[in-house]
Each structure stands twice: as C-alpha cells, then as structure tokens.
Amino acid sequence: MFKVAIIGDSASVSGFASLGLYVFCETEPQKVSKLIKKLAVNNFAVIYITEPVASLVQDTINKYKNSQLPSIVLIPAIRGNTGEGMRAVHEAVEKAVGSDILKN
C-alpha cells in the first residue's frame, strides 16, 4: 500500500498528522535529502514538502522529477514561501492541457 508523507518545519506540517499523513519535522538539508531517498524506496507515493525546505534540497528533488513515484509536491509553509509550488502547478497544467487555464 502506498503512503503519503509531508516534510517541513514543525509549525507548518504537524497538523497534517490528523489527516493520516506521515509527518517529518525536518529542515536540515542533508537530513531532508536522506529522508526523501528513504521515503522513495519505502512505498511513499506522494511526498509533500514545504517551499522553504524544498529550496534547500532542489538537487535531490530534481532526481525524482521524471520518476513515476514518488510524486514530490511543493506546498506553502507558514512563512518563507517562494511561490515555486504554484509555479510548478501552473507549468503542469499548461503541459497537460496546452495552456495555463489557472492564469488570472
């Protein structure tokens, strides 16, 4: 059975445990990179990661960009957001349907 994880600072991710996600409160780049690799080989289909933490481990995230699993999805944190998560959603939508239907 596939699992869903979330990685980020405690204030941003701890509430997701009540939704059944595996919560990992981690912000140190080396530990986050190791964690992503570990989750990838342990049946985690989706890994949500806060934008500020994702910016620290972009090389690791890029290794999984063309992989079927896991799907790594950037989400906003309580603070320190870059807008990268939303840009990624816009790019995916544009690639899928041929135009950015989410554009304001």
Stretches with model-predicted labels:
Residues M1-S33:
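N-terminal first-folded block
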Residues S10, S14-G15, V41, I49-E51:
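N-terminal intrinsically disordered, cationic/polar leader segments
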Residues E28, T50-P52, P76:
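Short secondary-structure boundary segments
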Residues S33-K38, T82-G85:
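Short, charged, surface-exposed secondary-structure boundary motifs
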Residues K37, N62-K63:
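Extended, charged amphipathic alpha-helical "stalk" segments
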Residues N66-N104:
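C-terminal structural segments of small proteins and small subunits
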